[in-house]
Protein backbone atom coordinates (compact mmCIF):
# COMPACT_ATOMS: atom_id res chain seq x y z
CA UNK A 1 0.00 0.00 0.00
CA UNK A 2 1.19 3.44 -0.79
CA UNK A 3 0.92 6.36 1.60
CA UNK A 4 -1.92 7.81 -0.45
CA UNK A 5 -3.96 4.61 -0.13
CA UNK A 6 -3.26 4.37 3.60
CA UNK A 7 -4.28 8.00 4.10
CA UNK A 8 -7.44 7.64 2.03
CA UNK A 9 -8.48 4.52 3.90
CA UNK A 10 -7.52 5.46 7.48
CA UNK A 11 -7.38 9.27 7.63
CA UNK A 12 -10.07 9.52 10.33
CA UNK A 13 -8.26 7.01 12.54
CA UNK A 14 -4.91 8.69 11.98
CA UNK A 15 -6.30 12.12 12.89
CA UNK A 16 -8.01 10.67 15.98
CA UNK A 17 -4.83 8.96 17.22
CA UNK A 18 -2.69 12.06 16.63
CA UNK A 19 -5.25 14.24 18.43
CA UNK A 20 -5.27 11.86 21.41
CA UNK A 21 -1.47 11.88 21.58
CA UNK A 22 -1.30 15.68 21.44
CA UNK A 23 -4.00 16.12 24.08
CA UNK A 24 -2.28 13.53 26.28
CA UNK A 25 1.00 15.41 26.09
CA UNK A 26 -0.73 18.70 26.92
CA UNK A 27 -2.51 17.10 29.88
CA UNK A 28 0.71 15.58 31.21
CA UNK A 29 2.52 18.91 30.99
CA UNK A 30 -0.33 20.68 32.76
CA UNK A 31 -0.55 18.18 35.60
CA UNK A 32 3.20 18.00 36.14
CA UNK A 33 3.65 21.77 36.03
CA UNK A 34 0.75 22.61 38.34
CA UNK A 35 1.65 20.38 41.26
CA UNK A 36 3.29 22.99 43.42
CA UNK A 37 0.34 24.59 45.18
CA UNK A 38 1.72 24.07 48.66
CA UNK A 39 3.34 26.74 50.80
CA UNK A 40 7.00 26.94 51.63
CA UNK A 41 8.02 28.28 55.03
CA UNK A 42 11.40 29.24 56.44
CA UNK A 43 12.40 27.55 59.67
CA UNK A 44 13.25 29.94 62.50
CA UNK A 45 15.60 29.37 65.42
CA UNK A 46 14.07 26.85 67.83
CA UNK A 47 11.46 25.58 65.37
CA UNK A 48 10.79 21.89 64.93
CA UNK A 49 8.39 19.96 62.73
CA UNK A 50 6.05 19.63 65.69
CA UNK A 51 6.15 23.41 66.24
CA UNK A 52 5.29 23.92 62.56
CA UNK A 53 2.49 21.37 62.96
CA UNK A 54 1.13 23.32 65.95
CA UNK A 55 1.17 26.49 63.88
CA UNK A 56 -0.12 25.21 60.53
CA UNK A 57 -1.91 21.85 60.97
CA UNK A 58 -5.28 23.53 61.45
CA UNK A 59 -4.99 25.17 58.04
CA UNK A 60 -4.20 21.87 56.32
CA UNK A 61 -7.10 19.79 57.71
CA UNK A 62 -4.61 17.16 58.91
CA UNK A 63 -3.83 15.73 62.32
CA UNK A 64 -0.49 16.93 63.69
CA UNK A 65 1.14 13.49 63.36
CA UNK A 66 -0.02 13.24 59.74
CA UNK A 67 1.25 16.77 59.10
CA UNK A 68 4.71 15.91 60.46
CA UNK A 69 4.84 12.65 58.46
CA UNK A 70 3.85 14.48 55.26
CA UNK A 71 6.50 17.18 55.77
CA UNK A 72 9.19 14.55 56.47
CA UNK A 73 8.28 12.60 53.36
CA UNK A 74 7.93 15.54 50.94
CA UNK A 75 11.10 17.29 52.13
CA UNK A 76 13.22 14.12 52.38
CA UNK A 77 13.84 14.56 56.09
CA UNK A 78 14.82 11.08 57.25
CA UNK A 79 15.35 12.04 60.89
CA UNK A 80 12.76 14.84 61.01
CA UNK A 81 15.42 17.37 61.99
CA UNK A 82 15.28 20.91 60.60
CA UNK A 83 17.64 23.79 61.21
CA UNK A 84 17.14 27.53 61.28
CA UNK A 85 17.24 28.94 57.76
CA UNK A 86 15.93 25.76 56.11
CA UNK A 87 12.93 26.02 53.81
CA UNK A 88 10.32 23.28 54.01
CA UNK A 89 7.19 22.66 51.98
CA UNK A 90 4.10 22.25 54.15
CA UNK A 91 0.70 20.80 53.20
CA UNK A 92 -1.09 24.14 53.33
CA UNK A 93 -2.27 25.55 50.02
CA UNK A 94 -0.75 28.92 49.19
CA UNK A 95 -4.16 30.57 49.00
CA UNK A 96 -5.08 29.47 52.54
CA UNK A 97 -1.82 30.76 53.95
CA UNK A 98 -2.15 34.13 52.21
CA UNK A 99 -5.77 34.58 53.29
CA UNK A 100 -5.07 33.81 56.93
CA UNK A 101 -1.92 35.96 57.15
CA UNK A 102 -3.30 39.01 55.40
CA UNK A 103 -4.89 41.89 57.22
CA UNK A 104 -7.06 44.71 56.03
CA UNK A 105 -6.36 48.22 57.16
CA UNK A 106 -9.07 50.81 56.75
CA UNK A 107 -8.10 54.33 55.81
CA UNK A 108 -8.73 57.08 58.29
CA UNK A 109 -11.26 59.66 57.28
Curated annotation (Swiss-Prot):
Gene Ontology terms: biological process: division septum assembly; DNA repair; negative regulation of cell division; SOS response
Disulfide bonds: none
Gene3D superfamilies the UniProt entry points to: LysM domain
GO CC annotation terms, alphabetical: cytoplasm
Pfam (any one): LysM
Name of the molecule in the record: Cell division suppressor protein YneA
NCBIfam families named in the record: PRK14125.1
Role noted for this protein: Inhibits cell division during the SOS response. Affects a later stage of the cell division protein assembly, after the assembly of the Z ring, by probably suppressing recruitment of FtsL and/or DivIC to the division machinery.
Lineage: superkingdom: Bacteria
Domain LysM stretches: 39-90
Annotated signal peptide: none
Classification via InterPro entries: Cell_div_suppressor_YneA, LysM_dom, LysM_dom_sf
Localization per Swiss-Prot or TrEMBL: Cytoplasm
Keyword vocabulary terms for this entry: Cell cycle, Cell division, Cytoplasm, DNA damage, DNA repair, Septation, SOS response
Family: Belongs to the YneA family.
